[in-house]
Amino acid sequence: MTIRTQPRKVNAAVVNSHQQMSFHDLQLKAPHQNEVGVRIVACGICHTDLGFLSEGSILGHEGAGIVEQVGSAVTAVKPGDHVLLSYQSCGQCAPCHESQPFNCEHFAKLNFGFQRLDGSSAYPEGVQGHFFGQSAFANYCLVTEQNLVKIAPEFPLEVLAPLGCGMQTGAGTVLNTLKVKAGESLMVMGTGAVGLAAVMAAKIAGAKTIIAVDRDPARLALAIRLGATESINSDEENYLATLCPHLDYVIDTTGIGHLDELAQEVLKEGGTLVRLTGSCGETLTRGRKAISVVQGDSVAQDFLPRLVDYWQQGRFPVEQLITYYHFDDINRALKDAQNGKVIKPVLVWD
């Protein structure tokens, strides 16, 4: 059977010269044989989006929607299927073949390079798309089987959209990278979406001590509701004196430079500091180690269904982190995210 794919008119939020979003109608080329055209229903805003506000770019990488078109080589989904979108990988290199797409040899090109693997683009000249293999700040985008996950149609796309990046990173760090065991202890520095996902995952794992550190009392209170056993306000004088030493793990979501010193104070010998910001610090001592993690060492097709299951069970209540905005309000949503007014903004179409 011949599968015919077609170009499609797309309404997309494009970064303008003032680092604001302006909506434009664009003509997107037909999907390649390995691509899937998805009508976007909702998309989370991640802080990574805020770092790529270059003129002419279409951002957005926590998309969720409904399949409209499939290329001739696509077997995982069909038109009408509901999908969550995640990071892109090539599916061809050694790490991908070893079920480590988060270590894909082409990760930077495919997620931050605004291009397909072959260097081409489906977008008009002057417009940069394919961000994280998505560019989901639009009502339609092209993805591949590598960065979509099919879910049941009864699940709310607007609730589950944020799972594909930040939530996956925080929860995956706990469950995949560290493999936290019942009775272990950890501290989470920063209670944004990534940090709170780590808190929820630590509770799922059965951690005995879960310490949330932040300067926002409301977020610390939410962390307690989501499973933290203790909260510490880093704005309070002598807060270091209240910290419990001999922790198994510290997860830094903030990139604040003095964290390595703090980790030395609270980590047990042989403990692990996880940096989720890509920042570097001094070498740790006495058997302690510092590692960085990409996407929570998660294979989205395996891990996102786990998170959906936890959400169904009420153990991963992501909806408590979300503030909704219509796509028309994208600039307000981005500003609120940048100012820390909201934890996880999610854009929705009508």
Task: Write out the residue ranges for each language-model feature.
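Glycine-rich phosphate-binding loop and adjacent beta-alpha segment
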Residues: 257-316, 349-350
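Adenosine-nucleotide cofactor-binding segment
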Residues: 185-196, 200-262
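C-terminal hydrophobic helical "lid"/dimerization subdomain
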Residues: 1-12, 301-350
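NAD(P)H dinucleotide-binding glycine-rich loop of Rossmann-like/cofactor-binding domains
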Residues: 94-189
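N-terminal Rossmann-like NAD(P) cofactor-binding module of classical short-chain dehydrogenase/reductase
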Residues: 84, 250-251, 274
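Glycine-rich beta-strand-centered segment in the early N-terminal region that forms part
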Residues: 29-43, 53-97, 102, 152-155
